[in-house]
Amino acid sequence: AEDEKKYVKEISYDDLQQFIAQLRDIGIHPRSQARIISGIKSFYRFLLLDNYITNDPTELLESPKIGLKLPEVLTVNEINSILDTIDLTLPEGQRNRAMLEVLYSCGLRVSELTGLRYSDIYPKEGFIRVEGKGSKQRLVPISEVALREIKNYLYDRNSVVVKKGFEDILFLSRRGTALSRIMVFHIIKQQTEAAGIHKNVSPHTFRHSFATHLLEGGANLRAIQEMLGHEKITTTEIYTHIDREFLRKEILEHHPRSRPRT
């Protein structure tokens, strides 16, 4: 109705709270609510700077809490199933096996994996050198299993005609160039389906699984942060949420009081 309209100067904190409640009632997603509130706050900041208003009714306005979306994680058995279904009789079989072992063993980003060089591997020391975001380098421990698979792959790699400029790249395509990110996604999708795993698995899933399994095994969060190449510990802390979910499931599954008595 006409008499319900208000000028911008007349709108109060309570009016805005009512508006947000209406957004919630009509089913607007919390993320969309947060964007709307952010827009309103920006508008009122502009009015305040322009001296059109003297009080900002949005000052105490809070955005809705948005639930943390936990990344997909594979179990150890699922990882093993994916690796075990790789057909080593195929020309690219050993490459794929070594590649996925390294991905899981070291928790690499897909760009770090495709850019990995033969000269980045230090088998005696048990480390690989990784170039992460912003060209920052870090040393990451590599498992004996992954090193063995790389050694096996190198026999096949020697039969590939390598294009100029890619001589030091570890994981090569059939054309003798570095594997593309899309190709790595495709290989993982193919192997996940072959293993009968019905999850949305990507290269990043292996990275998430690496971090989660370390945390479940009792690894220090700072050590995981270092291995993942996270600048901030808060980025790594998402895995504590996954670990809590793992613990919750373990309790529900194994604790004698977790199920109602019949």
Residue ranges and their predicted role:
Residues A1-T262:
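Conserved catalytic core of the tyrosine transesterase superfamily
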